[in-house]
Amino acid sequence: MTTSFKGTKPSRRQFLSGAAAAGAGTFVAAQARAAGDPAITELQPWTQQLGDGVDVAPYGMPSEYESHVKRRTVEWLTADPISSINFTPLHELDGIITPNGLCFERHHGGAAHIDPAEHRLMINGLVETPLVFTMQDLMRFPRENHVYFLECAANSGMEWRGSQLNGCQFTHGMIHNVMYTGIPLRLLLQEAGVKTEGKWILPEGADAAAMTRSIPMEKALDDCLVAFKMNGEALRTEQGYPVRLVVPGWEGNMWVKWLRRIEVGDKPWHHREETSKYTDLLADGKARRFTWEMDAKSVITNPSPQAPLTHGKGPTVLTGMAWSGRGTIPRVDVTTDGGITWHQARISGPSLDKSMHRFYYEFDWDGGPLYLQSRAHDSTGYVQPTKDQLREFRGVNSIYHNNGIQTWYVNEEGIAENVEIS
Amino acid sequence: MSKSLKLYAGSALGAAIILTGAMNFADRNITQLPENAAVMGAAPESPDTMFIAAATASGAEAEGPFGLGREALPEEIAAWDIDIRPDGKGLPEGRGNVWDGEGVFVEQCAVCHGDFGEGVGRWPVLTGGFDTLTDQRPVKTTGSYWPYLSTVWDYVHRAMPFGNAQSLTDDEVYAITAYLLNMNGLVDGDFELSHENFSEVTLPNEDGFYMDDREELELPEFTRDPCMENCKESVEITMRAAVLDVTPDEAVQTMEESGEDHGTDMAAADDGAATEAEADTAEDAETPALDMALVDEGEKVFRKCKACHQVGDGASHRVGPQLNGVMGRELGAAEDFRYSSTMEEMGEEGIVWTEETMAEFLAKPRSYVKGTKMSFPGLRSDEEIAAVTEYLKSFSQ
């Protein structure tokens, strides 16, 4: 265990039992006043001795003091760890870009390890000429770069019946936001020549789930990408190396990874992941299908249950993320009193279409209880609803598309908890 | 002469020089674009909007056709185009009845889904659940929720059994589908499903779905100016996550403390504790020295086995038995696993898993143990077999 304050990660139970290091900062400050801060007055080994040579880590990794910053899973959610999910540690990140190694994983048949030399992309069905591309072929098409969020339709799905998981990593961590480099899907379809009756596409993965989803041609020709790079480097294995589909603003399940085939057809296929799964069962026993767009949503990442307020009263930075599958986020409101009074947060960083946005709200914490919420407005005028507003329309059995307003209750010790409020 | 031209001056291919020169020029031209007021328009108000303008500028690339790729051959399309639609498009000729389906199901599916589709552990329940879709806990099965039979056929055919996808014959898929219909009370025990009668079968919940109507129903309601001040009188907590207390805790997620049976605990192994586990294994391996490089190699090969077999700390039976201690043990001897009768008999005859027997089995599982439940077709190379055997040995000492 390191003595560095940042590296000290008391467990959630410790926080909840009140044994948090809440006073640690104050303690260090007091000590410094008395005898001088040893971090300054004593010669540190890293100041005296030489550091690592250049090639110690040919592929660089985060500092050893950041080892707590990692994806985490919730074992009881799925039957096994292969067709499973883990979550992005949103509370440890800032800015708008998710580092590649922290992008949450969702596989249906495990993360396939594919030799790019053996990978092919086929386009068949209602096209003039069915085609096969090698990775080398794909690299010769014009490329574009775009930052998009990818959110699993089931993000926050465990919260329909009420507060369940204590941490924004678990309640909201099925999302990431990266810059993709890819080929407009339109160009590949044009290369094969879509016949006039071709109204849908069926992308298919090369993994052991052979994932398939039906996507309307209008979207395919609009902004979909066949991407091979994320944040400048090759896609990670778990994100579909060597090539994946990017379906901006639409639910993550449609972004088929390890993409090996695109079929053009005249009707949707109604495959497993668009009938049995990824359909939204409503209170009347009927289900919505083809709920592709991700509604506008936001969450405060700090403070949050995994990131309590440890500095005591005084100047405090509240921050979080907001996004919409229908456009940009021109405005985010936050409240510290459970929605009696709202304040406009400050958005900092690029405001890009169908990308995550970073917001901040700085305030003086008086040490009293806080009821924190954020509310996203998107460029279409849509305002993020409360969880109860959503339940009025959908009941509690939807699983998917829960974009309700999240509440964190922060007590006098700075400990935060996932709650719902009146 | 420019530096780039000097570089290419020695080239025998004049065309290449011209082409490269052109690309080089184009490249420079692109880097100059931001200075071009005509392209960028008026000076942007802030760096953020400049970013937007640059990022959303599209349609700049050539539209083709580029003449890239090659025509797909009919046999290639046939190999990959396996999808089935509700109208029967894509369905291959074939047939299978409930009786045969039960046999295949018990062999291939029951380990996860239960003999009657009731679901083992958290694996999907396939049967029943009728009239539960408005309940507190709806049971969504192929019978109660799935709209189309084609979805069942397509999914079983493309992704099942879990860990050995696309290994079932078309007739087996017809048979399993018929058995699922029978278990859901939708057909009699003497029913046979084929490409001929497929479209006659409808599932009860076919009309239980409709197109996304959020745009008409919800968006108007959620598109309005929200209250900013004095929005409510008071605030009470109505529900708290701490009551349920189901959040994974860092403190209890380490390998040391998950010593008790955590079942499928591969997540814990990912949690950085994997190195500890490996170290332990290396320490224990004092008896016949293991070739650690080969063990590492074998760990990679074992990925092919992982969907059905677990090995290491906390390993438990899945589709296949857990493999701790397998080397040196009789065939079919792991406790509480339902082996094929052949496998058990061979064990009773005293046949033991050695490098030789394992090699024979892994090369052609079904010919070494006739009737084995392991549907894996076998490993192609002797190197892979040697590596995975060495890997298994590391858990058998």
Task: Go through the PLM ranges and name each one.
Chain A
Residues 1-14, 21, 28-29:
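N-terminal secretory signal peptides
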Residues 17-18, 77:
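Intrinsically disordered, low-complexity segments enriched in polar/charged small residues
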Residues 19-20, 251:
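Enrichment for repetitive, rod-forming helical segments
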Residues 35-422:
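Structured, non-membrane catalytic/scaffold regions adjacent to prosthetic-group chemistry
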